């Protein structure tokens, strides 16, 4: 995904007010820079798709069939949006809970989950049982999540506790995620690291002037960014 494409889709997201947080397209761009998608026409699960901007990219630019799945955005709302974008024949809107996804095992070439996985995937068995099982042998899971730069062990700064609220236990470090999603007989490779797109993705969110973005920016102005980061998780499933 080139810088020009990234800017093109960011312009779409600004115009239609579809951003719901840090720019998922910028995070996706970094994830894809570490791998090659390969052939056109892949079957992709966009898990926690929100308003479907990443689904739009895969449908229009990669010719993929995308199952855009979200718990908080209705399938009807997303379907109407996809019709407006002219991609309703390539994106299937699904309303579902990540704990009980209605898909067959070994079904997807690629699973993408950006800024959502930390809400439901922090138990050690979840990835192996609920996520990896859906991916075809040789396929990939691409995950980007907000996290912590260091582990505080119950002594989080007040600023962090105020921003995270009751969800503070969902924000983990790179090392904690390595313990949760480690290598297994079912994986060929697992890469977990801090992302470089942190500042840019957040700034795009602040630039929308959304009321929630303005609240987040106030926390950043107080120094929140010294504690949090974005973490990438790239897993390739074993061929057999």
Describe the residue ranges of each PLM region.
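Short, glycine-/aromatic-enriched active-site segment of Class I SAM-dependent methyltransferases
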Residues: 11, 146-167
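Class I SAM-dependent methyltransferase SAM/SAH-binding core
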Residues: 45, 51-100
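Conserved alpha-helix/loop element of class I SAM-dependent methyltransferases that forms part
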Residues: 21-40
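Class I SAM-dependent methyltransferase Rossmann-like catalytic core
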Residues: 9-24
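A short SAM/SAH-binding and catalytic strip from SAM-dependent methyltransferases
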Residues: 110-123
């Amino acid at each position: 995904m080139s810088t020009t494409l990234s800017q093109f889709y960011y312009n779409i997201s600004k115009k239609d007010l579809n951003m719901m947080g840090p720019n998922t397209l910028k995070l996706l761009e970094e994830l894809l820079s570490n791998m090659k998608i390969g052939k056109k026409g892949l079957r992709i699960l966009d898990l926690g798709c929100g308003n479907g901007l990443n689904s739009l990219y895969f449908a229009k630019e990669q010719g993929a069939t995308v199952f855009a799945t979200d718990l908080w955005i209705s399938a009807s709302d997303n379907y109407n949006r996809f019709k407006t974008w002219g991609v309703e024949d390539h994106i299937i809107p699904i309303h579902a809970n990540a704990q009980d996804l209605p898909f067959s095992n070994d079904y997807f070439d690629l699973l993408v989950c950006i800024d959502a996985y930390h809400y439901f995937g922090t138990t050690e068995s979840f990835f192996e049982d609920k996520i990896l099982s859906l991916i075809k042998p040789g396929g990939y899971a691409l995950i980007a999540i907000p996290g912590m730069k260091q582990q505080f062990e119950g002594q989080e700064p007040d600023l962090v506790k105020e921003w995270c609220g009751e969800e503070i236990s969902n924000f983990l470090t790179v090392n904690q995620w390595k313990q949760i999603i480690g290598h297994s007989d079912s994986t060929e490779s697992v890469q977990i690291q801090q992302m470089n797109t942190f500042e840019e993705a957040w700034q795009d969110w602040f630039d929308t002037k959304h009321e929630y973005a303005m609240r987040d920016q106030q926390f950043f102005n107080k120094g929140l960014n010294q504690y949090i980061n974005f973490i990438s998780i790239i897993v390739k499933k074993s061929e057999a």
